[in-house]
């Protein structure tokens, strides 16, 4: 079997993906690359997993060296909404992978655009579109390279970030958002199921590249339905047992809520919210596909069930 690499093998999506992947493929065929390889659980290393040290801040030469010998690479996008820097470091990594001889690149994109669209309103999507375009260009110029872009849906676990909540428990009596509560919503999806779905795609390609149906294609993994903000708040009310209303406010009022300033820190980052809500208003976060269900072999977990889990988890930590 081909050697599989994950970079960076850290964070929620990276950890979920390699944890699921290691139950599907021989561990001695997997290379995990991250900034702190010593943090990879020892049980995986003892089972044959190779660990290497690198990050997006590594030089192009160092990235090429750690990608050497890897046939299939899962490149997880750089965790920043800053467009140009994100594009710069991801382009460097993609070029290094091609030079190292990687044969197929899976890229973790974002489902913040209409399904299969090549343009989007959300600034946070811009670097993903750049990287998808660069992958296509690399593949056209190099016959030995192919790609799959996995557009991952918005995490249900991130609902508090968008809705301006300090957390899942003890929500305020009124949630304030800069949008019509009954307008286009979000097809929320459980984060670990995105990791599992990504792992299954990688394992499927590794086992039979010639029959893999998503070669040189974009695949969108979403939740099973789109929830309006009013519906989502109803779920939170039901799960927490509290009567919560939702109110449309101006974008400035929304951004000036203390919890939003705490989430986003800098004005530059907070300003990505302007385009994010424009995208939501245009239905660009509401796309639903059956692909994740087909890959998992079951219906993805409902938004309500995931919120229940999040509320219980947070309560146990308080």
Map each language-model feature to its residues.
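Amphipathic terminal alpha-helices
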Residues: 291-318
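Oxidoreductase cofactor-interface core, primarily capturing Rossmann-like NAD(P)-dependent enzymes
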Residues: 2-40, 57-60, 81-85, 100, ...
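Short, amphipathic alpha-helical "lid/cap" segments that border enzyme active or binding sites
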Residues: 64, 91-94, 191-199, 303-308
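NAD(P)-cofactor binding segment of oxidoreductase domains
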Residues: 66-105, 129-137
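Conserved Rossmann-fold cofactor-binding substructure of NAD(P)-dependent oxidoreductases
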Residues: 50-71
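Short loop/helix-cap segments at secondary-structure boundaries that form the rim of catalytic
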Residues: 39-47
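Terminal hydrophobic/aromatic helix or amphipathic segment near a protein terminus
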Residues: 221, 231-282
């Amino acid at each position: 079997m081909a050697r599989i690499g994950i970079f960076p093998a850290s964070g929620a999506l990276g950890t979920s993906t390699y944890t699921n992947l290691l139950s599907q493929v021989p561990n001695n065929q997997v290379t995990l690359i991250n900034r702190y390889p010593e943090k990879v659980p020892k049980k995986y290393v003892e089972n044959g997993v190779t660990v290497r040290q690198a990050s997006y801040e590594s030089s192009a030469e160092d990235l090429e060296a750690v990608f050497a010998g890897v046939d299939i690479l899962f490149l997880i996008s750089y965790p920043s909404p800053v467009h140009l820097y994100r594009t710069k470091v991801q382009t460097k990594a993609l070029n290094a992978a091609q030079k190292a001889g990687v044969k197929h690149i899976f890229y973790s994109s974002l489902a913040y655009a209409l399904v299969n669209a090549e343009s989007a309103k959300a600034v946070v999507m811009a670097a993903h579109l750049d990287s998808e375009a660069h992958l296509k260009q690399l593949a056209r110029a190099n016959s030995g390279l192919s790609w799959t872009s996995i557009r991952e849906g918005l995490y249900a676990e991130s609902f508090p970030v968008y809705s301006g909540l300090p957390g899942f428990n003890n929500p305020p009596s009124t949630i304030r958002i800069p949008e019509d509560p009954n307008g286009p919503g979000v097809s929320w999806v459980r984060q670990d199921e995105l990791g599992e779905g990504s792992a299954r795609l990688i394992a499927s390609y590794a086992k039979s590249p010639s029959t893999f149906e998503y070669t040189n294609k974009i695949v969108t993994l979403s939740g099973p339905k789109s929830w309006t903000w009013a519906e989502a708040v109803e779920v939170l009310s039901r799960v927490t047992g509290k009567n919560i209303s939702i109110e449309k406010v101006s974008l400035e009022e929304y951004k000036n809520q203390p919890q939003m300033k705490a989430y986003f820190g800098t004005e530059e980052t907070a300003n990505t919210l302007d385009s994010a809500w424009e995208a939501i208003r245009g239905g660009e976060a509401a796309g639903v596909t059956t692909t994740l269900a087909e890959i998992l072999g079951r219906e993805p977990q409902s938004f309500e069930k995931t919120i229940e889990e999040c509320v219980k988890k947070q309560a146990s930590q308080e």
